[in-house]
């Protein structure tokens, strides 16, 4: 016997004991969102039918993964939260007659006269497992092209230099609009605009106006007697007869499907033109910057040091200026570099697609650290080299704040990257939520205040965190929090600067990220609102049977606020989960006011909090430094070893991309 998704969902809902109780009218109102009703009361039939059609259309619309950034999660008609809430209560209590007058069924509740479902309340979902973050593939925008790193399953040639794309993993870049394939080193040298770009419908406007180049190819169908590759997309042209097109003038070959996408560069050698232009620019720059006086006497002339040396010197000098430096018994040498041989690995603390987190001991000492081990081939394959270097920078910066995870050092081998961080043996908040169900308001307030302190520190440095969740908030042995995992951070977001990357954990994503809009640090306050909701209530505020339905819920529904939480807690949750980011409570510059001034945090003495002088409401019962009771036993029972990488893949990796990763934090001392 076959069942529809709606019937299965209804059966699961009726059997679930973890969901909050609802009246019969509310349950019917929730179900009308997903299924068609063959029978309906008078005055409600047309409304419910319209709702079913709208819901079906919505599901069809979300099957396409390209809906991100097109506002597909918005409803045609929006109402305020209070308006929607009171309207639903009135419609459920008003009976059939009121439904006839307004176009809303007595039991339908959330269906407008136009047949569009606008019920803004959602049923919470219990937190049963960990949720991983997602990140859309990084794009490189050059001349209208949107290049992404890609793995090519067949021999492919570069459209710029006409050389073969070698290597394992993702060998080159391909434009997702016009399918042009190039090397990573060649993608920023293309002269022609993307022929499918939104900036122009003609691919040669820039060349025609600036370089006076507008030479269309004269393509003719051609039968190739040997294997031939397309000069546009780089792939093999298959078939036995008339496999593609060939230009009569310059012998450029392409698929029939690539003809309209090929730039008008007949007889033009892009590589030679780019080299000539670079030579001219280099000569002009050298003439402009050549000093008339010796470098030491010319204040405009600077000699830039390497990135790593500059950062270490800067942070060390800033630390000395703070006046809080006390000479310990033993100080880490300022430029000492550590290696994998300096540590003894003891246990596995966590594991993921990125690699592992291992508990390790510094040899000849009694100091223990958590070492995050990343496989280089995975980092390169996901094009996450920049994210890895950003994580190292933020971790080094976090040493200056008491509620951010502290970095000891970083080093690398041929196959792995290593982050040596402080060992926080109190577990993460996800572990404690699953153990306790939910936190008391006092405990949630304390954790929330320390998280706010850490977020404000990052925001003042122009950093968007973008991955705040229960899994990334850890407890130390005293019970204070530490924010960890900075791989999703975005740097240099000051004043009116914004970001637009689609990344984060789906349950914690702000509506503006889902809709593809530009955003700033306000997305972190939305994520904090979701996290605070989960700490106070023990459930996620938004739910959906799949990712698309979850995103629709986040953008259009309001969460349920139970009666057992205080009015102050309800007020701050509503302020944080405000869908209009301009009205969302958060930083001191927000029109809604500084979150630290909210009545919910009135019992907090922020001065004492910054000094870690407030007693935590919960202290982990850690018996000894190697106690791993607050970590998942599935991991701690595993054998401690690093996953090896294939020798051929290892030999093909470009190690230069990880230059500058090795670092020793001058702030950390051994007492």
Swiss-Prot record:
Gly residues bias locations: 102-116
Biased composition (Basic and acidic residues): 57-101
Keyword entries, A-Z: ATP-binding, Kinase, Metal-binding, Nucleotide-binding, Phosphoprotein, Repeat, Serine/threonine-protein kinase, Transferase, Zinc, Zinc-finger
Pfam family, one: C1_1
Catalytic residues, chain numbering: 467 (proton acceptor)
GO-annotated biological processes: flight; intracellular signal transduction
Domain AGC-kinase C-terminal: 602-671
SMART domains: C1 (SM00109), S_TK_X (SM00133), S_TKc (SM00220)
Low complexity: bias regions: 14-27
Annotated segments matching region Disordered: 1-136
Catalytic reaction equation(s): L-seryl-[protein] + ATP = O-phospho-L-seryl-[protein] + ADP + H(+); L-threonyl-[protein] + ATP = O-phospho-L-threonyl-[protein] + ADP + H(+)
Gene Ontology CC, one term: plasma membrane
EC number, as in UniProt: 2.7.11.13
Residues reported to bind ATP: 349-357, 372
Entry's family note: Belongs to the protein kinase superfamily. AGC Ser/Thr protein kinase family. PKC subfamily.
Protein name (record): Putative protein kinase C delta type homolog
UniProt organism field: Drosophila melanogaster
Gene name in the database record: Pkcdelta
């Amino acid at each position: 016997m076959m069942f529809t998704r709606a019937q299965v969902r209804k059966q699961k809902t009726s059997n679930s004991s973890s969901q909050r109780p609802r009246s019969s009218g509310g349950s019917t109102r929730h179900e009308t969102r997903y299924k068609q009703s063959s029978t309906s009361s008078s005055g409600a039939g047309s409304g419910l039918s319209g709702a079913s059609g709208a819901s079906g259309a919505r599901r069809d619309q979300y099957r396409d993964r390209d809906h991100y950034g097109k506002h597909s999660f918005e409803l045609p008609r929006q109402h305020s939260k209070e308006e929607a809430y009171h309207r639903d209560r009135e419609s459920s209590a008003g009976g059939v007659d009121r439904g006839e007058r307004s176009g809303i069924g007595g039991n339908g509740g959330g269906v407008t006269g136009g047949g569009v479902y606008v019920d803004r309340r959602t049923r919470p979902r219990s937190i049963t497992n960990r949720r991983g973050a997602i990140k859309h593939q990084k794009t490189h925008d050059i001349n209208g092209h949107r290049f992404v790193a890609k793995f090519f399953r067949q021999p492919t040639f570069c459209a710029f230099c006409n050389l073969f794309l070698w290597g394992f993993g993702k060998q080159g870049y391909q434009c997702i609009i016009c399918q042009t394939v190039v090397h990573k080193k060649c993608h920023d040298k293309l002269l022609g605009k993307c022929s499918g770009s939104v900036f122009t419908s003609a691919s040669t406007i820039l060349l025609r106006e600036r370089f006076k180049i507008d030479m269309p190819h004269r393509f003719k169908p051609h039968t190739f007697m040997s294997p031939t590759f397309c000069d546009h997309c780089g792939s093999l042209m298959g078939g036995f007869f008339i496999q593609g097109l060939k230009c009569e003038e310059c012998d450029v070959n392409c698929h029939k499907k690539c003809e309209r996408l090929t730039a008008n560069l007949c007889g033009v050698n892009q590589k030679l033109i780019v080299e000539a232009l670079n030579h001219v620019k280099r000569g002009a720059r050298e003439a402009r910057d050549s000093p008339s006086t010796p470098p030491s006497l010319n204040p405009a002339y600077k000699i830039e040091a390497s990135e790593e040396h500059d950062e270490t010197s800067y942070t060390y000098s800033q630390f000395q200026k703070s006046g809080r430096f006390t000479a310990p018994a033993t100080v880490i040498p300022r430029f000492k570099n550590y290696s994998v041989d300096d540590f003894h690995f003891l246990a596995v603390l966590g594991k993921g697609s990125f690699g592992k987190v291992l508990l390790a001991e510094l040899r000849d000492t009694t100091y223990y650290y958590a070492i995050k081990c990343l496989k280089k081939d995975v980092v390169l394959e996901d094009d996450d080299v920049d994210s890895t270097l950003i994580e190292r920078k933020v971790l080094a910066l976090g040493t200056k704040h008491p509620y951010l995870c502290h970095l000891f050092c970083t080093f690398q081998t041929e196959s792995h990257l290593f982050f040596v961080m402080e060992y926080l043996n109190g577990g993460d908040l996800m572990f404690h939520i699953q153990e306790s169900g939910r936190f008391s308001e006092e405990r949630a307030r304390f954790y929330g205040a320390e998280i706010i302190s850490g977020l404000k520190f990052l925001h003042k440095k122009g950093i968007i965190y973008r991955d705040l969740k229960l899994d990334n908030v850890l407890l130390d042995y005293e019970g204070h929090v530490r924010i960890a995992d900075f791989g999703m951070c975005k740097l240099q977001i000051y004043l009116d600067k914004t970001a637009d990357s689609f990344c984060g954990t789906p349950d914690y994503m702000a509506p503006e990220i889902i809709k593809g809009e530009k955003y700033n640090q306000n997305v972190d306050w939305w994520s904090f609102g979701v996290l605070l909701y989960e700490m106070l209530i023990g459930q996620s505020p938004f739910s959906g049977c799949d990712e698309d339905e979850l995103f629709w819920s986040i953008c259009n529904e309001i969460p349920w606020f139970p009666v057992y939480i205080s009015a102050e807690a309800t007020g701050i949750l509503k302020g944080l989960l405000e869908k209009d980011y301009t009205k969302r409570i958060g930083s001191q510059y927000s029109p809604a006011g500084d979150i630290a001034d909210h009545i919910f945090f009135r019992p907090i003495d922020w001065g004492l909090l910054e000094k870690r002088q407030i007693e935590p409401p919960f202290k982990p019962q850690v018996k000894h430094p190697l106690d791993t009771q607050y970590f998942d036993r599935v991991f701690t029972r595993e054998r401690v070893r690093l996953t090896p990488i294939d020798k051929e893949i290892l030999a093909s990796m470009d190690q230069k991309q990880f230059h500058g990763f090795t670092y020793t934090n001058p702030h950390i001392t051994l007492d």
